[in-house]
Design a protein with these regions (language model features):
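Transmembrane alpha-helical segments
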Residues: 105-106, 282-287, 331-335, 426, ...
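Active-site lumenal/periplasmic loops and adjacent helix-entry segments of GT-C-fold
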Residues: 102-246, 383
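Hydrophobic, aromatic-rich transmembrane alpha-helices
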Residues: 298-306, 316-326, 369-411, 458, ...
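Hydrophobic/aromatic-rich transmembrane helices and adjacent perimembrane loops
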Residues: 129, 192-193, 240, 244-246, ...
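Short periplasmic/luminal acceptor-recognition loop of GT-C membrane glycosyltransferases, typified by
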Residues: 476-481, 486-497, 502-549, 565, ...
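Signature aromatic-anchored transmembrane alpha helix within multi-pass, membrane-resident enzymes
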Residues: 267-276, 316-326, 450, 456-482, ...
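Membrane-interface helix-loop-helix junctions at transmembrane boundaries of multi-pass membrane enzymes
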Residues: 85-89, 93-94, 207-209, 214, ...
């Protein structure tokens, strides 16, 4: 039911709110907008109004209700206009809206065809949890990010407390609240819906350029999903996906500025003012070059300078546009010093920004703006390199035909929009960094594909077969690139995140909480537990045991942390893993799930904690002299010796494994051998079991498509769609094994059409764990110092002085 609410009801709610608010703008402006522009204008209203209402704490929680009320008001006052449109509809009227729906289905395809609650681009953009947490907090506390919760407050303060644009976030939080669904599952659909609005605008522009309804629908759909845009949408670029339809909308308003101004005069500026302010709210002051240049073009289109009277009208119109945009964009323009400082911080005048490429592995190429990139990632060279460049060449030819078509049709307004877009790109590119330049190329890409499709269809109008070939080549290039990205995107683990969310709800308010595993979405899912993560970028103060240090992106065993750093937490949430040690003796197990365990501190801290095992064998048999030394300390302190007994794990030596050529070796963050599966492949390794019994088999790493696991040629499991950050482990199955040698084989077969099927399968560990070898299965016992010899020869997780 939640899945249907996310992929069906949420889009209907989004489009309904946009429609209602768009009709309201029509009424206020006093004229009818082109039908395909009503929803994009209405979305602009959602952005600017939600930014105003989330500006102050008293009004922030009312934002969803206010947006709903405005939409209902628009439906009411615009009912007559809707009825009139329906009665005046012409044949094929439905093709325009089809562009928006088709775009949504294409961009949301990974979630839709996964058939479960998830989102795309997991592990690719490390700020996703920050965006969600910021959106959620905006709705309840407005722009007040002052909180004492260590990582939560510090992280949100570093982002949203410094003028970070939040137009998309306030809309996400508001419509998410109305839908009743968790924001984490709405993150991908929202961005697909935002692009669907761009598709409507492109379809209208294509129709304006003289194409048939069917051609315009195809142009609108495909121009809104070039490879680079699709890649950024899958990655979760909420700011850029929010601004894109507003930029295109401003371009469309240039084309109809004259008609609107003739009909209603100065009120015709209202749609543009809303689009411009929404663009500023979406990406901050960086949108100002688009707003200024597009605004000047729209003004010239509406008020051609033929005489002195026109100059006066032009000045009045310009003042109206500027003042209106600044006023409606006040939440962004108001704190100007913060906004400018943020913009400067991501420009090439900032040495830190210049040296930080974000998650890009290399600077993006200008050719990537042309919509074709036949590979699973925009960050590297395409898999099908030759085909990519052939298709890019065809796109370039079609762009030439597109400009010729627009010139012959005298589509001056559209040409001005296209030219202005290139000018803005060139201007901002001069001051950009690797990271921001990539975003600029992405925002330019739909313009290039739009012109190419106009050109291809223009040729088709005069030379049918040749034009059809050109259209087919562009469609294959763009949609084929999207298909490969769809196939390779990494989907979030539904069941594990659902379990984390349930922990966040069940134990809300029992913090502070330690989460030793590096999982960026802990910041959002465990936000009510006052969570802190030692491997996070803005973690609290942690001390580490000898031989360990704090590093971003690392997961840590509790034994890697100094005892005081553990004991300051009331609650511990940790992954079930054969590699993790049991918490100290004064913590007891509260809850165990499939993926996580929750522990609560119940007594005073031990006087000392002595960890024993390492890596995938967290237990060890300590020398008797070590136990005797602890016993001496216990006797002197008048205490006892506490211990956690744990059988020894059996890790497989992957360095000696036999592998297919399609498996590529490397090392993980801990320096262990790591193997990436580059296609159908096999990995086989052996080990000797010392004692017959039932063992749990664990894999360490990530798995996309089903990975068949065989022990002695007997299939025991085939995990799939399980991934995570450092330290991720997968509980495959339990098997009865005899004493002696055994073989373990991992088989990755060919793929299919499911999303994430060509994502990532990386294995850096195989472990056999005997019964009782899990942290949650250990029991803590104690002995008097005089009985220390009873511990000799036993496998222990740790020893404590209590």
């Amino acid at each position: 039911m939640h899945y249907l609410a996310v992929v069906v009801l949420f889009p209907l709610l989004f489009w309904g709110l946009s429609l209602g608010c768009g009709l309201l703008v029509e009424r206020l402006a006093g004229t009818a907008l082109p039908s395909l522009l009503v929803l994009p204008v209405g979305f602009g209203v959602l952005v600017v109004v939600s930014q105003f209402t989330t500006w102050t704490a008293p009004t922030a929680p009312l934002t969803p209700v206010i947006l709903l009320a405005l939409a209902l008001l628009g439906m009411t006052v615009g009912r007559a206009a809707l009825v009139q449109r329906w009665r005046a509809r012409s044949g094929g009227w439905w093709l325009g809206p089809v562009a928006g729906v088709a775009c949504y289905l294409i961009v949301a395809a990974p979630v839709i065809f996964a058939g479960r609650l998830t989102f795309s681009g997991y592990l690719l953009d490390t700020t996703g949890a920050i965006q969600l947490a910021g959106a959620e907090r905006l709705l309840h506390h407005a722009h007040d990010f002052s909180t004492t919760v260590p990582i939560y407050g510090t992280t949100l303060g570093a982002y949203f407390g410094n003028g970070y644009p939040s137009g998309g976030h306030s809309v996400l939080a508001s419509i998410g609240w109305l839908s009743g669904q968790d924001l984490i599952w709405l993150y991908s659909p929202l961005q697909a819906l935002e692009l669907s609005l761009a598709a409507l605008v492109f379809a209208w522009l294509a129709r304006r350029a003289g194409l048939s309804r069917l051609m315009a629908t195809i142009v609108g759909t495909v121009a809104s999903v070039p490879a680079l845009v699709y890649a950024y949408a899958l990655m979760g670029s909420i700011k850029e996906m929010t601004v894109l339809p507003m930029l295109v909308l401003m371009g469309a308003l240039i084309a109809c500025a004259s008609e609107l101004r003739t009909a209603v005069g100065v009120r015709a500026a209202l749609p543009f003012v809303i689009a411009g302010a929404a663009a500023l709210d979406a990406i901050g002051i960086a949108a100002s070059p688009w707003v200024a240049l597009f605004g000047a073009a729209a003004l010239l289109a509406a008020v051609p300078l033929r005489g002195r009277r026109d100059i006066r009208s032009f000045v009045i119109g310009g003042a109206t546009l500027a003042a209106g945009t600044a006023l409606i964009g006040l939440p962004t323009v108001g704190p100007l010093s913060k906004t400018l400082k943020l913009a400067e911080g991501v420009s090439n005048s900032n040495a830190t920004a210049v040296s930080d490429p974000g998650n890009l592995l290399r600077p993006l190429k200008f050719l990537q703006t042309l919509g074709v990139w036949l590979g699973e990632s925009h960050r590297v060279e395409p898999r099908y390199l030759n085909q990519t460049y052939v298709l890019i060449g065809i796109v370039v030819v079609c762009i030439g035909f597109g400009f010729l078509w627009l010139l012959r049709r005298r589509s001056w307004a559209i040409l001005v929009f296209l030219t202005a877009s290139v000018i803005v790109w060139a201007l901002l590119h001069r001051h950009g960094t690797t990271w921001t330049d990539g975003k600029l190329l992405m925002l330019l890409s739909p313009i290039a594909v739009f012109v190419a499709l106009i050109g291809a269809f223009g040729v088709m109008r005069t030379r049918g077969l040749e034009g059809l070939i050109l259209v087919g080549a562009v469609l294959v290039g763009v949609l084929g690139s999207d298909a490969l990205l769809y196939h390779g995107t990494n989907l979030a683990p539904t069941q594990r995140f659902s379990e984390l969310a349930s922990i966040g709800t069940r134990y809300a308010g029992v913090g502070p909480t330690l989460a030793t595993d590096f999982e960026e979405y802990d910041l959002y899912l465990l936000r009510k537990l006052e969570v802190d993560i030692p491997g996070a970028a803005y973690s609290g103060p942690f001390q580490f045991a000898a031989g360990f240090s704090g590093q971003y992106g690392h997961s840590y065993d509790l034994d890697a942390l100094a005892l005081p750093s553990v004991e300051r937490f009331r609650t511990i949430v940790m992954r079930r893993s054969p590699a993790w040690s049991r918490p100290p003796s004064n913590y007891r197990l509260l809850w165990r799930g499939r993926y996580y365990t929750v522990w609560r501190r119940t007594g005073p801290a031990p006087l000392a904690h002595f960890p024993l095992g390492t890596g995938f064998t967290p237990s060890a048999v300590p020398p008797c002299r070590v136990i005797r030394r602890v016993a001496t300390q216990a006797r002197q302190a008048g205490g006892r010796i506490a211990y956690a007994q744990r059988p020894l794990n059996l890790p497989v030596d992957l360095a000696r494994s036999v592998r297919s050529p399609a498996i590529f070796p490397s090392t993980d963050l801990e320096g262990r051998p790591q193997f990436s599966f580059g296609g159908p492949a096999r990995l086989e390794a052996g080990l000797r079991v010392p004692v017959a019994g039932r063992y749990e088999l664990w894999l360490a790493g990530d798995v996309d498509r089903p990975l068949e696991v065989l022990v002695d040629d007997r299939r025991i499991g085939a995990p799939s769609a399980q991934s995570g950050d450092d330290g991720t482990v997968i509980d495959v199955a339990a098997a009865n094994l005899s004493a002696g040698p055994h073989s373990i084989r991992l088989l990755r077969h060919g793929g299919d059409l499911r999303p994430d099927d060509a994502g990532s399968t990386v294995i850096d560990g195989i472990v056999l764990a005997p019964p009782g070898a899990a942290a949650e299965a250990e029991t803590v016992q104690s002995v008097a110092p005089s009985a220390w010899r009873s511990l000799c020869g036993r496998p222990l997780d740790w020893i404590e002085l209590t």
